[in-house]
Curated annotation (Swiss-Prot):
A GO term, aspect molecular function: phosphoribosyl-AMP cyclohydrolase activity
One of the record's GO cellular component terms: cytoplasm
Protein name listed in UniProt: Phosphoribosyl-AMP cyclohydrolase
Residues reported to bind Mg(2+): D78, D80, D82
Length: 131
């Protein structure tokens, strides 16, 4: 592991740090996930976003199933060292597992959350019927 890469990052008690994927061109926030030290190291080594799945308890590369990979253009660490922003190029224009550009597709409209973004590709087309 690269000590210079990891020493400034404040991983939580579970060894994770918040990772935000933001489109490098539009600046739209596409998703928020978690990274452990291994996922961060793999991201730097490969140039593609890797995360740690809390539900599956394993590291994964974004797009390994869907093909919607995230090419990292820049990594930024916040002032407290406990959150990372990755400026990325989103392959296929879909970051969300629901088939939308962003995971942040719901908008509060005063009394309810409304879906603001259309599905670009159906989940079954992306992952097959087993997802």
């Amino acid at each position: 592991m690269d000590k210079n890469l990891l020493e400034a990052v404040k991983f939580d008690e579970k060894g994770l740090v918040c990772a935000i994927a933001q489109d490098a061109e539009t600046k739209r926030v596409l998703m928020v996930a978690w990274m452990n030290a291994e996922a961060l190291q793999k991201t730097v080594e490969t140039g593609f976003a890797h995360y740690y799945s809390r539900s599956r308890q394993k590291q994964w590369m974004k797009g390994e199933e869907s093909g919607h990979t995230q090419k990292v253009r820049e990594l930024r660490l916040d002032c407290d060292g406990d959150a990372i922003v990755m400026l990325i190029a989103q392959n296929g224009g879909i970051a969300c597992h629901t088939g939308r550009e962003s995971c942040f597709y719901k908008v509060w409209r005063g009394s309810a959350w409304e879906t603001a973004d259309a599905v670009l590709k159906d989940e079954k087309e992306i992952y097959g019927s087993t997802h």
